[in-house]
């Protein structure tokens, strides 16, 4: 049987909790990351208690000095949780009482509950974590834009259904991975509008009768506002679910980029060579160079999705207000952040060091009759309805396949036999360079549009960095 010595609760109980309950309730193994935020919030709470007339100036200063000492010891690792500590809050109160005594240390608990306390600390931690993750995503975007800028005219096979479709610029394809990552960062920046609301002062669920000032503590802690509803403030974790969704979406977007790298690095594709420092070998096959970073990105995306779904399952069907189920809200989010902080620098390094075989990509770009659409559109420009033009281009492909030649190698008579408008001049559009250059509307793969797009992506990344620092 455990005791309640040092616990934040217990007066109503004759005995401490059973050992199995104490073990089940324990959370210091994961919530200790909140300790620095708890110390900062406790300082703000001490000042609010003083302004409410619940502490003398001497008591306030004594608490602040004790919290300063405790914060320093937490930062350098000389103070940490004991086996007997239930959670980060109890451990820190124990540390404060060790420094200032039980009479003064016990005064800090006035007007706050672990319910509003942990909801506030979780938001503080997550707002900082989101900025770190966003910075990491922008590093990957930076690697993509640098590679795009280094290959402004390289042509590659564009694919749908993993089948050769139309020629595109390599830079266009790389930027297609940058855009969703920028949207992820935009979501993280927008997330802060909803996360920047302070639950402090909500108490267990009903607010406080002690004349506290939730707006003052919200401002001191860097929140935009205090919560309007104390029940919602202590019981809601939609902010955590929102962040977990964006983290999982980042994982999905990185996984799609990773899949391209994996395919491109195969012998069959041969588009890229992996840098030695960003790949691994085989324990038995000496020739192997494995895309482990990309494969781990695929694997971790599943983990991130699992964290999101696990959190949502925890949140569903809880009655208002706070329930102990919410002890399970933090580990999935903490883990998602930890995984992304491992993955993002590795992905940025992988992308930045890819060596592209642009000759190989250019050689493969026209294969599979990828210029058939150009034939159809050439006919449309000559007044042929697209349905008819599509049929004619398909017939030209069938004829070329039957002879084992390219579209440009069909005889004039063969072209005319397919459609009277298919004259020898159609060969003018049967080059990958001409195909790419012709797609010069906004969003297209023409070099002029891709150059504009590259500048816009870089501008967007710079603006997102500024938003994240506000």
UniProtKB/Swiss-Prot annotation:
Pfam families: ASL_C2 (PF14698), Lyase_1 (PF00206). The keyword Nucleotidyltransferase does not apply. One of its GO terms (biological process) is arginine biosynthetic process via ornithine. One of its GO terms (molecular function) is argininosuccinate lyase activity. Its EC number is 4.3.2.1. It is found in: Cytoplasm. Pathway: Amino-acid biosynthesis; L-arginine biosynthesis; L-arginine from L-ornithine and carbamoyl phosphate: step 3/3. Keywords: Amino-acid biosynthesis, Arginine biosynthesis, Cytoplasm, Lyase. PROSITE patterns: FUMARATE_LYASES (PS00163). CDD domains: Argininosuccinate_lyase. Belongs to the lyase 1 family. Argininosuccinate lyase subfamily. NCBIfam families: argH. This is Argininosuccinate lyase.
């Amino acid at each position: 049987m455990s005791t309640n010595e040092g616990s934040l609760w217990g007066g109503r109980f004759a005995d401490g909790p059973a050992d199995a309950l104490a073990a089940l309730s324990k959370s210091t193994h994961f919530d200790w990351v909140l300790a620095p935020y708890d110390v900062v919030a406790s300082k703000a709470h001490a000042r609010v208690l003083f302004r409410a007339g619940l502490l003398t100036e001497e008591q306030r200063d004594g608490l602040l000095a004790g919290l300063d000492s405790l914060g320093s010891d937490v930062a350098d690792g000389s103070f940490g949780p004991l086996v007997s500590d239930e959670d980060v809050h109890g451990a820190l109160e124990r540390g404060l009482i060790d420094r200032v005594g039980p009479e003064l240390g016990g005064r800090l608990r006035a007007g706050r509950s672990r319910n509003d306390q942990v909801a506030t600390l979780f938001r503080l931690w997550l707002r900082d974590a989101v900025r770190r993750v966003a910075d990491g995503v922008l590093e990957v975007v930076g690697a993509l834009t640098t590679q795009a800028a280094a290959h402004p005219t390289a042509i590659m096979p564009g694919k749908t259904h993993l089948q050769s479709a139309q020629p595109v610029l390599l830079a266009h394809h790389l930027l297609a991975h940058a855009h969703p990552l920028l949207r992820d960062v935009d979501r993280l920046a927008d997330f802060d509008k909803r996360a920047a609301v302070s639950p402090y002062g909500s108490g267990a669920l009903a607010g406080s009768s002690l004349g506290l000032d939730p707006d003052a503590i919200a401002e001191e802690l860097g929140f935009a506002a205090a919560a309007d509803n104390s029940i919602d403030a202590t019981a809601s974790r939609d902010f955590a679910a929102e962040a977990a969704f964006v983290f999982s979406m980042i994982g999905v977007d990185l996984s799609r980029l990773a899949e391209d790298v994996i395919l491109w690095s195969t012998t069959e594709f041969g588009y890229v060579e992996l840098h030695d420092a960003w790949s691994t070998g085989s324990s038995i096959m000496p020739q192997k160079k494995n895309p482990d970073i990309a494969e781990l990105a695929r694997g971790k995306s599943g983990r991130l999705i699992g964290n999101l779904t696990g959190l949502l399952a925890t949140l569903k069907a809880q009655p208002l207000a706070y329930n102990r189920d919410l002890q399970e809200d933090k580990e999935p989010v903490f883990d998602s952040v930890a995984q992304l902080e491992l993955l993002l620098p590795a992905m940025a390094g992988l992308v930045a060091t890819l060596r592209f075989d642009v000759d190989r990509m250019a050689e493969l770009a026209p294969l599979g009759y990828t210029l058939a659409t150009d034939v159809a559109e050439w006919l449309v420009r000559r007044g042929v309805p697209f349905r008819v033009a599509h049929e004619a281009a398909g017939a030209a492909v069938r004829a070329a396949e039957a002879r084992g030649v390219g579209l440009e190698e069909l005889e004039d008579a063969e072209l005319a036999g397919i459609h009277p408008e298919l004259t020898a001049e159609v060969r003018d559009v049967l080059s990958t360079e001409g195909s790419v250059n012709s797609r010069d509307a906004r969003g297209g793969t023409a070099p002029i549009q891709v150059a504009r797009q590259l500048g816009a992506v870089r501008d967007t990344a710079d603006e997102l960095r500024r938003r994240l620092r506000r």
